Amino acid sequence: MFTGGYTQKLLRINLSTASYKVEDIPESYYRELLGGRGVAAKYYYDEIGAEVSAFSDDNKIIFMTGPLTGTPVYSGTKFQLATKSPLSDKYICSNSSGYFGPYLKGAGYDGIIIEGKSSKPVYITIDDDSISFHDAGHIMGKTTFEVIDYMEQTHDIKRGVMSIGPAGENRVSYSCIQVEDRSFGRGGSGAVMGDKNLKAMAVKTNNKVKLHNEKALREYMTANVKACKEGKPTHTSHGTAQYTEVINDLGCYSVANFQTAVLEDASSIYATEMVKNYKTGNAACYRCPVACAQVCEVKEGPFKGAISDPEFETIGAFGGQCCVLDFAAIIKANQDCDAFGIDTMQAGTMIAFAMELNQRGLLNDKQLNGLDLSWGNGDTVIKLLKMISYREGLGDLLAKSPYEIAAEYPDYAKYLMHVKGMSYAAYEPRGFYGMGLAYGTSARGACHNVGGWTIRDELTSGKFDRFAIVGKGKMVKDIQDTRAYVDSLGICTVVRSSMGFTDNPSGNILEYVTGVDFTPELMDIGERVYSLERMIYAREGITRKDDYLPDRTMTEKLPKGMAEGSVLTKEMYDEMLEEYYDLRDWDTNGIPTDKGISRLALTELLKG
């Protein structure tokens, strides 16, 4: 019996009938899967079949908080999403911070399931137990920033707003659901929400999340704040942008659609220059003392007035991939992506893809329509982001999933750098092989987060030889399992270690919050979540063949830098993959075995 952390209530909203009901969430879901990503995957497994497509009325959007979401635990802001992705027509998980998750928990719900499809544009407001449907016709076409302004003026809700922009309305395959200035960034959930004619949701509450032992928890957090801040000092001063210089120097950066891994003359987009020339302050997520977001403003030039907080991945997408060395253009591109509601990472990679097609003479005059697609052209990047969001001209092609593009233009396929429809992150896997395995086996495509952030283990700590093969299966599995349980908790990975949430979990936070000491079981829960997601994938037709990387990664040697000459061949990759599958109790085709399913206690859970 839980005495805090959970409400054990699910809000199920049917858009087709403009109705809702509140359901109990079985306690067993929490005990075996914790919350967040794990419980969302369970509902997906039960309710979204393999035959359902992303834009089917039968597709659903499942939002789920974790036990620490909305609590005094540092960074307790995260909540998770599961749906069928328009990038692949397969399972996708995604997470966001912002205030919607914490406020949803305060309003009395651990999660929401959106089902059906509205016959007209709507938005939904949640005020504790009052759920209201509103006509959204007059706010269609508005940016996500404009939706926030509307919600504040009309409903007195500024924080706790979740919306899509024009990209979601136009079903861009990698459009986002924005949560204030944060987002469910990867996987195209914004397009699913747009297809359902749901423009926005907003929640407000004055209620706090119930805690098992609030006094002990607050004492622990007060004592821990120094360690939390001091453990990430450069995140406060420079944010994740600090990694741009590190990764570029090591020859592992995403450059020119992964043709190379070193960006020349890149100092103008390094964090030191960002801080010196553009930073105006820091922004923090709910209950976070680190405040890693670096708020930047362009003070002069054609992009004067642009304000955003570019992360490492966004800088990599537009700076590295598109070779844009004007940081002002990157700030503007980031702002526009947030406003239009599109994934900066996939957008940058798709524009880089177009730039390579242009480099190789594969785009005709009609497709180009006067666009200058030369590498480094920031003005063209800005133009294309709008064209993609509104599906105009070449933007309509680039708004599609890699699978759609490859089917329509087979000659373009070899230049699409993706796994399962999701583009690579800003890390070149030929520069550190574990990242390649992480991309290939990620539970949502080529993702460095869900797949495994191997940078610390392979590049900065010296724990593993980055070009080694043996041992990488276990390394990646451990990172993935850790991330799976952290995503199920409802906290951010940046501050997790200072609170004991590592691959060797410790501490009493979960007991203080829920009354149950989950800590010794966390890695097992993470592994259970990951294999559950793979069971979903297997049901949807994903096998070993889908875990392979693009040909460029496996056949072309890096031309320069500290990893010059490196290539991750199929034979090398297979060796890592075999080790990984064996440790997970998956068969040689990547399918979870009965032995593994039983060992992880998934057999009984999935009957319920």
What are these regions (language model features)?
Residues 152-187, 193-608:
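Extended C-terminal regions of large enzymes
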Residues 1-190, 195-211, 218-235, 239, ...:
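Protein-protein interaction/assembly regions in multi-subunit complexes
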